[in-house]
């Protein structure tokens, strides 16, 4: 029974995410973490103006401890009061940390706009899920950006937090999401964030090292399950998985490019500045709007495989503890 109680929150959290997606109208813990980071950033820039690297370390540790210890305390209290109250709360917390449905919904807005031949609407939709400047993107560039985002965020938004929750429940999942949120907000190499965001960026690279590679391998397996090109997925992953400034981002992008037999990445504009980037994959065929749907299928299949793996891992860990 105790092993069952340990695995229910992760399973229930994923099911809730698949059914409901992000509750945009309700307070979201990750958005609260984002606001906390913004407040701390202003304080750090004021108090550590001449030592921003140190300030970034202080900020990161503060965010990580706060984001993980608060849910840990709440869960300890609820489990002490009633075990099923704890299970319900942890299930909800796990649900908040997964973004599969949100990723699908937002990318499908791009797909629908492309189908309607409304390039401006598609450009606006894709701007909500990518960090690059979208104004220079043509139709194929918009599709490519959406596919890349689904591929990359399969790890960041779904399987990586799932793996951390499998290891340490919701509190460890919040630890990961806090680090990932900091990286997305301050982990840039621009002059503004180079020093204050250095620690957050490096920490995110470390935390994602294993999850991104494990996700890539599961995505290759998913390519075979979905009758995509599994051989090319393996080939392109082996060849192009390091073609990114981040040691982790190209892992799943390379698999997706190979599985779909398209070319992703390449030069992109950020904050009005052109960044030269290598291509990932081969343009065996021209990218098309249906590739957004295919990328989502890859994302969901990979997520289910990771869920099965993490559920087994959590059961084994609790079996050893008990």
Q: Where on the chain are the PLM-derived regions?
A:
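Glycine-rich phosphate/dinucleotide-binding loop and adjoining beta-alpha-beta core of small-molecule
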Residues: 184
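Hydrophobic alpha-helical transmembrane segments
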Residues: 1-175, 179, 187-322
């Amino acid at each position: 029974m105790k092993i069952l109680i340990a695995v229910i929150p992760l399973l229930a959290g994923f099911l809730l995410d698949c059914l409901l997606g992000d509750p945009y109208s309700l307070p979201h813990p990750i958005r609260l973490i984002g606001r906390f980071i913004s407040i701390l950033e202003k304080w750090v820039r004021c108090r550590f103006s001449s030592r921003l690297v140190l300030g970034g370390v202080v900020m990161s540790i503060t965010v990580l401890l706060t984001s993980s210890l608060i849910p840990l305390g709440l869960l300890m209290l609820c489990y002490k009061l009633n075990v099923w109250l704890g299970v319900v709360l942890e299930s909800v917390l796990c649900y908040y940390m997964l973004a599969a449905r949100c990723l699908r919904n937002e990318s499908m807005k791009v797909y629908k706009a492309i189908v309607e031949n409304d390039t401006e609407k598609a450009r606006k939709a894709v701007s909500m899920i990518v960090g690059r400047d979208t104004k220079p993107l043509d139709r194929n560039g918009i599709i490519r950006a959406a596919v890349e985002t689904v591929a990359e965020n399969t790890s960041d938004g779904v399987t990586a937090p799932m793996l951390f929750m499998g290891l340490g429940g919701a509190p460890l999942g919040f630890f990961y999401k806090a680090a990932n949120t900091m990286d997305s907000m301050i982990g840039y190499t621009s002059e503004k964030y180079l020093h204050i965001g250095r620690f957050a960026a490096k920490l995110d690279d470390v935390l994602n090292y294993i999850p991104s590679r494990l996700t890539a391998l599961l995505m290759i397996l998913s390519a075979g399950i979905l009758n995509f090109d599994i051989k090319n997925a393996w080939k392109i992953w082996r060849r192009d998985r390091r073609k990114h400034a981040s040691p982790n981002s190209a892992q799943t992008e390379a698999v997706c490019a190979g599985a779909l037999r398209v070319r992703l990445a390449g030069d992109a504009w950020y904050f009005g500045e052109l960044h030269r980037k290598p291509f990932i994959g081969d343009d065996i065929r021209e990218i098309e709007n249906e590739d957004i749907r295919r990328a989502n299928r890859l994302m969901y299949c990979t997520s289910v495989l990771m869920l099965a793996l993490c559920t087994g891992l959590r059961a084994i860990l609790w079996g050893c503890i008990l």
